[in-house]
Amino acid sequence: MLSTLARAATRRPLTVMLLWGLFLLLGFGLGTGVFGRLSDDVPDVPGTESQVAAEHLDGLDPAGDSITGVVEAAAVADPAVRAEVRRAVADLREVAGVAEVPDPYATPGTVAEDGRALVVSVTLEGGLDDDAEEAAVDDAADRLHGIDGSAVSGVHVSGGPLLGQQLGERAQEDVKNAELISLPVVLVLLLVVFGGLRAAGLPLLVAVAGIAGAFLALFGFSHVTDISVYAIQVTTMLGLGLAVDYALLMLVRFREERRHIPDVVEAVHRTVAAAGRTVLFSGLTVAVSLAGLLVFPSTFLRSMGLAVAAVVVVDMLAALTLLPALLTRFGGRIPPAKARPEEEGRLFARLARFAARRRVAVLAVAVPALLVVALPVTGMSINLGDARQLPKSTEARQLYDAIEAHFPPGTGVSPVTVVLRPGTDTATADRIGAIAGGTTVRDLPGGTTVLELPAGGAADGPAATELVERVRDLRGDAPVQVTGSAAQLVDFRQMLADRAPWAALTVLTGIFVLLFAFTGSVLLPLRTVATTLLSLGAALGAVVWVFQDGHLAGPIGAEGLGALSLTAPPLIIAIAFGLAMDYELFILARMREARERTGDDREAVVTGLRRSGRVVTCAALLLAVVFGAFMTGGFSPILQIGLGLTLAVLIDATVVRMLLVPATMALLGRHAWWAPKPLRRAHERFGVREEAPGPAPAPPQPAAR
């Protein structure tokens, strides 16, 4: 397959570049439409009690979405403010698609006790199509923002479909800013690596293809499932980072090949045959790591896993087709690598020899140190999060802060909703209804009764969680179901706990098979997984320490929220594990190549690290720059994911790959490459091998006359 791709790219480079040009137009033209289709992060898990109950209620009483406005003033009872608000309420009731707008002055609980704020709730009609709903939301928001006057100090509007629209606009701005920050820095680093603009510019072209692929993949998935506002940032930063990494690996190999092969086309073929296989397996390992997300029956996690996997495939194809085509056309102008193999990477060779010579000491220091950093993971907690996760400049966050400042805890939080199906006995209904004060009752068609219990605080707080568990304990065998945000979180946490072992088994099995196919060893995959888990645990522990416990949160613009976003841990684990496999394959490819050439196991470790250390370090720095740029947006989940991935790649590329890998390889010795005879025969037949670089082929001799 790789030889076919190489031939196509070298024989028809202009055609390949034209096809990728059309792909870029499609990605940046059609794909950017995804920013208008983003939603806030909802942990729906099909088949769970909370989701089944919510769907049952929607079928009986298809209520429309709602938006909320908070009006702040020195005194909302001021006649001028009252007149402005009531004028706006009257206007809102005339908006097409609006079902209900209660008078805040006549509705209990909507005027703050301090008299300095009030809430205006706008409920839309159910069953509106997308265009009608968007028009109604925009019109209603404009009329709420129209509440002004000298006595009004501020109006904040958000919620429902407006929240998704606001987050989409902010996400688009953040992605643009992150690209403007990261691309110039990446270019500077590539200039340092390659010493010339021609070579440095090619990875950026591949990166642009990765970004277009991210937009297009998400736009496609947005037509079949909800796409979280955080998905666009995660996929874009990963698409950009991996594209640069893969292009870097290919370009470094191309320059090495050009050192002894004058023919550009031949050098491209040998680059694809050697480094291309590493890129292919790297992409597959990242995709397998993300396959673990498909085990979770969560629409969000599955759509995220599929979207990111699609982006990885686009990056991989761009590195294997677009870059070879570009090298065919412009590679002759790129100077070959200057240093000889025995001269390059001396620092990494010294590190490898030190770690191999002091392997027991290195393991005795590095492993406990990483375990200590990972300790906070044992107390990790996740929650739904609230508007505190949003940047303070977003209107949704400003609305949240206004409610927090003027109203009692729990105001504006969705209640714990209890669905009493037909057949529920009166005694059970009475016991549940008496749990919390302020319970409201609604009767729906078909004999269903709904109890709405005040959550008593944030939907992801301990009071709401305890309330859900108490209701479920009290119902016995009665046909009673609990839904609402708090119940969704309880079910989501339980789903993660139930499916996490299966997800881990899926990922580890897939990784083991791929690494065995790549190396022919059964011990190397086990060693790789063990060392990768150390770096992953340390990175996740640091994220918990910063964001959950609140240490050092200020310098990076975060807040100690007492828990991580429910999206952060699974995404950090899946993506970081795949990225770590990337670096492992970069190093193992060089080690195996040196071992097959020399037969010396220990020297192969040194040579492998010497030849790959610079690439791995540069790749980690480039990814860290990209992840860091996306952390400037201020979304707390993105800050958590960005910090986790940045630390994971830096720890993995330094402590793990530069110290633990040579130390463990030296400890295993020749047994590192061991496999039972049946598996060894299977690998000889079905395994994957790279073509090692060698001298340029001799020129053809003229035919005898």
Swiss-Prot record:
Record's superkingdom?
Bacteria
Which keywords label this protein?
A: Cell membrane, Membrane, Transmembrane, Transmembrane helix
- Spell out the subcellular localization from the entry: Cell membrane
Instruction: Choose one Gene Ontology CC annotation of this protein and give it.
Output: plasma membrane
What SUPFAM superfamilies does the database record attribute to this sequence?
Multidrug efflux transporter AcrB transmembrane domain
User: Which named protein is this?
Assistant: Putative membrane protein SCO6666
Q: How does it sit in the membrane?
A: Multi-pass membrane protein
Matching Pfam families, A to Z?
MMPL
Where would you find the membrane-spanning parts of this chain?
16-36, 144-164, 177-197, 201-221, 232-252, 280-300, 306-326, 360-380, 504-524, 528-548, 561-581, 615-635, 636-656
- Report the sequence similarity comment from the record: Belongs to the resistance-nodulation-cell division (RND) (TC 2.A.6) family. MmpL subfamily.
- PANTHER family per UniProt: MEMBRANE PROTEIN MJ1562-RELATED (PTHR33406), MEMBRANE PROTEIN SCO6666-RELATED (PTHR33406:SF11)
Query: Origin organism of this chain?
Result: Streptomyces coelicolor (strain ATCC BAA-471 / A3(2) / M145)
